[in-house]
Amino acid sequence: MNNISQIRRQLGITQRELAHHIGWGQPRIANYETGLREPSLGVAQKIVQALNALGAQVSIEDVFPFQN
């Protein structure tokens, strides 16, 4: 699982706002948050960059922790 939703809520932004910042639709963010879709490395980097641009200070490992 990932921490997109938790970090996004801490920033006080909606899925739509995060998606708009990246240039995507809100359902795509929802699918990543719920685990319906698994992001590629490039997509994960875009999400982390957007979260940081919106006020977070997170790394890719913070947002997408390694799981065995």
Where are these regions (language model features)?
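Key DNA-contacting residues within the recognition helix of helix-turn-helix
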Residues: 5, 19, 30-31, 45-48, ...
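DNA major-groove recognition helix of helix-turn-helix/homeodomain DNA-binding modules
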Residues: 42-60
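Short amphipathic recognition helices of helix-turn-helix/homeodomain-type DNA-binding modules
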Residues: 58-68
